[in-house]
A protein has these predicted regions:
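Extracytoplasmic gating/loop element in the C-terminal half of outer-membrane beta-barrel translocons
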Residues: 4-8, 19, 67-164
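Acidic, glycine-anchored loop motifs typical of Ca2+
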Residues: 15-33
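Extracytoplasmic loops and strand-loop junctions of Gram-negative outer membrane beta-barrel proteins
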Residues: 28-37, 42, 94-96, 124-132, ...
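Flexible, surface-exposed loop regions and adjacent strand-edge segments
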Residues: 33, 77-87, 178-184
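Hydrophobic, lipid-facing positions within transmembrane beta-strands of outer-membrane proteins
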Residues: 45-51, 58, 141-146
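Structural signature of outer-membrane beta-barrel domains
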Residues: 56, 67-71, 151, 170-176
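Repeated loop/turn-to-beta-strand initiation elements of outer-membrane beta-barrel proteins
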Residues: 57-62, 153-154
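Membrane-embedded beta-strand positions of outer-membrane beta-barrel proteins
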Residues: 62, 165-167
């Protein structure tokens, strides 16, 4: 069985094989217990797109890159916060959205939380599950370059054939549904 001592604020798992227990079965494809395939972490449909244009000495180049389909099951302290004992845990603002059923708690009541109650000593709430399976598809503006080519009649006065001034930026925008704690 997966875990014991269940309480309010724990994740509820479905008994898929109907045996009355939440378990991993025999861990085989024929007898997987209450597990099933819920995603695919392999990036599918990778893309890159170059766009460029010029007008009266000005030029603009854009490079987009991304993945159109990918599933991600977050794990570890960065996602869960309270994981691995009180001396090895980290807490960021999103981790404060955890289950609290005590109206006198300093952070207040939170019965509709994103995270289960924090538990350092038990991984039962951190099993692979659809609740925390994330869409890791993204599109990123990897590079933008904006430039201006000075007219040759001006540059030749300084014995220069060609002079271009430009400004460039990297990773300026990312569009994703992935949790803000992660960079796709």
């Amino acid at each position: 069985a997966i875990g014991s001592g269940w309480r309010a604020g724990d994740i509820m798992y479905k008994d898929l094989d109907g045996n009355g227990a939440i378990d991993r079965g025999e861990g085989t494809a024929d007898k997987p217990g209450d597990r099933k395939i819920i995603g695919n972490s392999t990036p599918r449909y990778n893309f890159g797109l170059n766009l460029s244009g010029e007008w009266k000495g000005f030029d603009l180049k854009l490079f987009f890159q991304g993945v159109l389909k990918r599933d991600y099951m977050a794990s570890g302290m960065m996602f869960w916060g309270a994981d691995g004992g009180k001396w090895q845990s980290m807490v960021y603002k999103p981790h404060l959205d955890y289950f609290r059923d005590d109206p006198n708690h300093p952070l207040g009541l939170n019965l509709d939380a994103y995270y289960p109650w924090p538990n350092w000593n038990d991984s039962k709430n951190r099993q692979t599950q659809t609740r925390y399976l994330q869409n890791a598809a993204y599109a990123r503006l990897k590079n933008v370059t904006f430039g201006y080519r000075l007219p040759s009649h001006f540059t030749q006065k300084f014995s220069v054939n060609n002079l271009r001034l430009f400004i460039s930026g990297e990773n300026l925008l990312t569009f994703t549904k992935l949790s803000k704690m992660f960079d796709p």
